[in-house]
């Protein structure tokens, strides 16, 4: 999801 991608980016996953 878009929110999931945001969380991933914020968490440094990407």
From Swiss-Prot:
One term under GO cellular component: extracellular region
UniProt subcellular location: Secreted
Listed GO biological process terms: adaptive immune response; blood coagulation; innate immune response
Disulfide-linked positions: none
Coiled-coil region: none
Keyword Coiled coil annotated: yes
PTM comment text: Conversion of fibrinogen to fibrin is triggered by thrombin, which cleaves fibrinopeptides A and B from alpha and beta chains, and thus exposes the N-terminal polymerization sites responsible for the formation of the soft clot. The soft clot is converted into the hard clot by factor XIIIA which catalyzes the epsilon-(gamma-glutamyl)lysine cross-linking between gamma chains (stronger) and between alpha chains (weaker) of different monomers. Forms F13A-mediated cross-links between a glutamine and the epsilon-amino group of a lysine residue, forming fibronectin-fibrinogen heteropolymers.
UniProt KW keywords: Adaptive immunity, Blood coagulation, Coiled coil, Disulfide bond, Hemostasis, Immunity, Innate immunity, Secreted
Main location: secreted
UniProt function note: Cleaved by the protease thrombin to yield monomers which, together with fibrinogen beta (FGB) and fibrinogen gamma (FGG), polymerize to form an insoluble fibrin matrix. Fibrin has a major function in hemostasis as one of the primary components of blood clots. In addition, functions during the early stages of wound repair to stabilize the lesion and guide cell migration during re-epithelialization. Was originally thought to be essential for platelet aggregation, based on in vitro studies using anticoagulated blood.
Quaternary structure and partners: Heterohexamer; disulfide linked. Contains 2 sets of 3 non-identical chains (alpha, beta and gamma). The 2 heterotrimers are in head to head conformation with the N-termini in a small central domain.
Domain free text: A long coiled coil structure formed by 3 polypeptide chains connects the central nodule to the C-terminal domains (distal nodules). The long C-terminal ends of the alpha chains fold back, contributing a fourth strand to the coiled coil structure.
Protein name (Swiss-Prot/TrEMBL): Fibrinogen alpha chain
Organism expressing this protein natively: Equus caballus
Lineage, opening ranks: Eukaryota, Metazoa, Chordata, Craniata, Vertebrata
